[in-house]
Design a protein with these regions (language model features):
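Fe-S ferredoxin-like electron-transfer domains
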Residues: 55, 61, 66-155
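Short, structural beta-strand-to-alpha-helix junction motif
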Residues: 33-36, 84
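Generic intrinsically disordered, low-complexity segments enriched for polar/acidic and small residues
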Residues: 18, 36, 43, 110, ...
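Short, electropositive, low-hydrophobicity segments enriched in small/polar residues
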Residues: 27, 35, 67
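Ubiquitin-like/PB1-type beta-grasp interaction modules and other compact soluble beta-rich domains
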Residues: 1-29, 41-64, 72, 76
C-alpha cells in the first residue's frame, strides 16, 4: 500500500529494486528503506519485544528505537528504517519463532506474573543453573546471532 506520488519524494518510482525478506521476494523502489518497502508490501509487525515478545511495528523511522532491528545480509541488528534497499539483499526477521506474526514465545505475555523485573537474577543464583539459564535467556532476548568468525563485524 503506497501513498500517491508526492512532490520532492525521496523514492524513484521509475526504478524497481528486488530483495528477499524471509525467503520471499519484495518489490521496492530505488530510495526506499528496507522498512518502508516492507511496510508498503503490507507488513506491520517488524519485531517482538525482548522479554514478553509483544508485537512491535515501525516507531521512529530515524534509527533511534529497536523496533526495526533485522538481520541484513548476515549482519544482525541492522536498523532497517534507515537502511536503503539494494538489489538482491537478503533480510531476515529476529527475535521471533517461527515467524513475526506467530511467535511462540509471545506466550510470555500471558505469563508475565511469573517474570517480574529482575527475576532471572534472583531465581538463577546457583552458578551451574545460571550457566544454563543465561544461554536460554539470551536466546529469548533475540538480539541476533553474532558470527563466530567475525565476518560481519562493523569497524
Amino acid at each position: 500500500m503506497r501513498l500517491p506520488p508526492q512532490v520532492n519524494e525521496r523514492i524513484d518510482r521509475s526504478t524497481n529494486v528486488q530483495f528477499a525478506f524471509n525467503g520471499k521476494s519484495i518489490e521496492a523502489f530505488d530510495g526506499d528503506t528496507v522498512a518502508s518497502a516492507l511496510y508498503a508490501s503490507g507488513m506491520r509487525i517488524f519485531s517482538r519485544s525482548f522479554k514478553y515478545h509483544r508485537p512491535r511495528g515501525l516507531l521512529c523511522g530515524a534509527g533511534h528505537c529497536p523496533n526495526c532491528l533485522m538481520n541484513v545480509d548476515g549482519v544482525p541488528n541492522v536498523r532497517t528504517c534507515i537502511t536503503p534497499v539494494r538489489e538482491g539483499m537478503v533480510v531476515h526477521h529476529q527475535n521471533a519463532w517461527p515467524s513475526l506474526n506467530n511467535d511462540l514465545l509471545s506466550v510470555n505475555d500471558k505469563l508475565d506474573f511469573l517474570m517480574p523485573v529482575g527475576f532471572y537474577y534472583k531465581t538463577f543464583t546457583h552458578p551451574r543453573v545460571w550457566k544454563i539459564a543465561e544461554s536460554v535467556i539470551r536466546r529469548a532476548a533475540g538480539l541476533g546471532v553474532v558470527p563466530e568468525d567475525g565476518s560481519s563485524v562493523v569497524e
